[in-house]
Every structure is written in structure tokens, then in C-alpha cells.
Amino acid sequence: MVCPHNNPKQGNTREMEDSIHTDFNNDMSYGDYLCLEQVLSAQHPQSEVHDEMLFIIIHQTSELWLKLAGNELDTMIHNVQQGDFSHAFKVISRVKQILNQLTQSWNILSTLTPVDYLKFRDALGRSSGFQSYGYRKIEFLLGNKNADLIQVHESNEQVHSELQGILERPSLYDEVIRVLHKQGLPIDDSALNRDFTQPYQANESVLNAWLSVYRNADEHFELYELAEKLIDIEDAFQQWRFKHMYAVQRIIGNKMGTGGSSGVSFLKKALDISFFPELFELRTHL
């Protein structure tokens, strides 16, 4: 018997197949389709420190995931407006996994020690994750509205205009509340026609509507499932927020952030913000 390790035809190798395309002089390649030349040349460290490349790539990839999450949430809002719950549920599942991916990215960044980070922190200037418009878009789409937070984007007219538009439109939860009303559950006008530029505040009529859904889950099963999937989104988002705060605390302690915030204490305040407050409150009353 011939030992397979001594036979290059059967050993630890894989030969090219004749059918595999190798000439892309006149065809679009993988790199062309993904614009990899631009993507992979978009890392410009401001120092000679090795670990700055890690810092840049983690944040760039996070921005891509945030862009995808924002795109999916736009689609989900449209699905909810149309009463298309089956597709909305599919999108929610995808957004949840995107948020899980973002949460895991903090584990990689946490390999950056305080000593490593201090070697290039000054090179960041005043740039900060607080200025991420991808993140701000998601916060606004989910209902955490605050007009003051788009001031940092006034230097970018296109971004500022997009965020202003999202600020003024109903959030995902606003659209869900409208669905409750359309399906015959009584909702106060103050919740249906509120100032959408303001952060959502819990409303007793909305709480009572959700209580009716949960107490009659078989009768309102789509709404019941929608509510639980919204809880999935908030749970995943809160885990991302917490992991962000903890990674920052691990690396810089209680120093001020590069963008001028109080740092960890500022991030901790976000943990008290709920996108869908009645969905948590109702559990107390069941």
C-alpha cells in the first residue's frame, strides 16, 4: 500500500479544476465587485504604532456592520408599515445577529492594553465613536431621538440631512404602536401623533394594549411574536452597549473620551435607556 503522504496526488493538496475562471481581463472579479482596492487601502494610521491598525480596522468593520443594520431597519420599518410581519420577522433575526457580531468585535479590541493604546491615542485628536453617524442612525431608527446629538455632523451636510430626516420621522416603535391601533387596540392620540423628534416616553395606553396582546396571545399571535422579537433586538443592543462600556473601561479607565465626553460614565448612562419600555414593564403586570 502506498502511503498517501508520499503521493502528491493524494496528499495534503488541492489541485486547480479546469473549469475555474482565471482570466479577468474582460470580466468582473471578486475584488472588482467588492471594490477591495479601495476598501483595503482605506486604513491610514496617524502614527507608527503597530496596534493602531487593529484600532482602525475594528472600527471600520463595525461601521460596515452598522451600515447593514441601518439598511435592514429601514426595510423592517417599511415591512411593519405594510403589515408584512413575516418579512419583518426575518429582518429582525438578521439585525439581532448583526448586533451580536458587533458585540463580539469588542473582544478583539480588548486585546489592546492601556499601554498599547496610550502609544497612539493622541493621534486620534478629537475623533470619537460618539461621532459615528451609522450608530446614531440606528439609535434614531429605534427611537432614542435627540436633536442635540446631530450637531457634531453639521460639517457634513449629507449626513446631517439624513439624520435630520430620520429624527423627524416615526421610529420603528412608533410604527409598531400604529399597528396596535390599526388592529383595534385603543391607543391615546398623544402616543400616535407625538413629536417624533423627541425620545419616546412610556404611555399607559400602549402598556394596556400590550397587556391585552400578552393576555390573549393566541388571538394576537403576530403582535405577540413581534413584541418578543423587539425584545430580542433591545437585548442584543444592550449587550453591545455594555460590552462597549466595559471595553472602554478596560482600556482607558475613567479618563475623558477623545471626543470630550466623560468617557465610561457617559456610556453607562446609555444602559438605562429603553427603546420599548412598555414591553419590559408589562412583565410586572402579567
Curated annotation (Swiss-Prot):
This protein's pathway: Amino-acid degradation; L-tryptophan degradation via kynurenine pathway; L-kynurenine from L-tryptophan: step 1/2
Residues engaged in binding heme: 244
Record GO biological process: L-tryptophan catabolic process to acetyl-CoA; L-tryptophan catabolic process to kynurenine
Family: Belongs to the tryptophan 2,3-dioxygenase family.
Pfam families associated with the record: Trp_dioxygenase
Annotated source species: Shewanella woodyi (strain ATCC 51908 / MS32)
Protein name per the record: Tryptophan 2,3-dioxygenase
Cofactor (UniProt): heme
One Gene Ontology term of the molecular function aspect: tryptophan 2,3-dioxygenase activity
Alphabetized UniProt keyword annotations: Dioxygenase, Heme, Iron, Metal-binding, Oxidoreductase, Tryptophan catabolism
Gene of this entry: kynA
Reactions mediated catalytically: L-tryptophan + O2 = N-formyl-L-kynurenine
Subunit structure: Homotetramer.
Cofactor binding description: Binds 1 heme group per subunit.
Top EC class of this enzyme: oxidoreductase
